[in-house]
Amino acid sequence: MILATTSSTCATLGEMVTVLSIDGGGIKGIIPAIILEFLEGQLQEVDNNADARLADYFDVIGGTSTGGLLTAMITTPNENNRPFAAAKDIVPFYFEHGPHIFNYSGSILGPMYDGKYLLQVLQEKLGETRVHQALTEVAISSFDIKTNKPVIFTKSNLAESPQLDAKMYDICYSTAAAPIYFPPHYFVTHTSNGDRYEFNLVDGGVATVGDPALLSLSVATKLAQVDPKFASIKSLDYKQMLLLSLGTGTNSEFDKTYTAQETAKWGPLRWMLAIQQMTNAASSYMTDYYISTVFQARHSQNNYLRVQENALTGTTTEMDDASEANMELLVQVGETLLKKPVSKDSPETYEEALKRFAKLLSDRKKLRANKASY
């Protein structure tokens, strides 16, 4: 979608709920990290503030799998109550830790990676920080294999579900614990009245199939109902939403299609390998299609921007290839994506659309600050 400033948008900008959603995709998280770095740089330039951070501008930041990790990095506070990581720190994080995270365990019967290094680095970076301390509302998904239900970690749910005030490193590992790749994660939380809760969690993509945009919008809707700063919003609809959704790239080889004659001879293993790829691609497409349709039906299509590379090839399609050569290729994918047109119908590039998005975010922040001062 092409983001544009309209008179109706400006009229209600101060009351808009801003949402950032980041897909899952393992090491391919480098692609949205490049986009986030560009956007944060634009916000710093527009507001003439080198300390400006994404968490200052978005009411809700949601992510699944590697998107959940990015969410935690830009919302978890440091000792100065500022995000412990700037957007420009994310790509170096992948380069430093990616090869150790995706270091084959050598196990034939167990998961491909033991997850020990991932959990260790998350503990070191995120410390004892819990959900309630996040600098803005978060929406990080996981799936409990014991209860067979999704688990959504958000600040706005804590009043009714205090057991969800887990440590951020437990949440981040859980949302990244993709079956086959990493072991499930078990941890326990205790509420203030002494109740004990157990969690047996795997990758959030099981709950959201990689794209948490709809989840993030749902959390934003609830936030507008319970947060006093949105008291002037009587009935939230998509006209009052500003959504930026970042993908981790799709495999262009998925588009080669298969014939009925070819697949008729496939066995369970061949289908198992192909169907996950098909499901992820189809789900991401349908999520984007649904959101686009709903925003358009509300005459708010300019409030939604999906940034996605749809032509990944070779090693860049792999979520666990953390070789330096492949990570460099993923950086190039992200940088090239910024120069590509948002749609076939317009010459506007993602870079130009994100600059416009940054201006809207800045204006919205200033309008809300001015309103709060009266």
Curated annotation (Swiss-Prot):
It is found in: Vacuole. One of its GO terms (molecular function) is monoacylglycerol lipase activity. Residues 20-217 form the PNPLA domain. A motif (DGA/G) lies at residues 203-205. It is an enzyme of class 3 (hydrolase). Its EC number is 3.1.1.-. PROSITE patterns: PNPLA (PS51635). Residues 1-11 form the signal peptide. GO terms for cellular component: vacuole. One of its GO terms (biological process) is lipid catabolic process. The keyword Transmembrane helix does not apply. Pfam families: Patatin. It comes from the Eukaryota. Residues 309-372 form a coiled coil. A motif (GXSXG) lies at residues 63-67. A motif (GXGXXG) lies at residues 24-29. SUPFAM superfamilies: FabD/lysophospholipase-like. Glycans are attached at N103. Keywords: Coiled coil, Glycoprotein, Hydrolase, Lipid degradation, Lipid metabolism, Plant defense, Signal, Storage protein, Vacuole. InterPro entries: Acyl_Trfase/lysoPLipase, PNPLA_dom. The nitrogen atoms of the two glycine residues in the GGXR motif define the oxyanion hole, and stabilize the oxyanion that forms during the nucleophilic attack by the catalytic serine during substrate cleavage. Belongs to the patatin family. Probable lipolytic acyl hydrolase (LAH), an activity which is thought to be involved in the response of tubers to pathogens. PANTHER family: PATATIN GROUP D-2, XYLOSE ISOMERASE. Patatin have a dual role as a somatic storage protein and as an enzyme involved in host resistance. This is Patatin-2-Kuras 4. It comes from Solanum tuberosum. The lineage of its organism: Eukaryota, Viridiplantae, Streptophyta, Embryophyta, Tracheophyta.
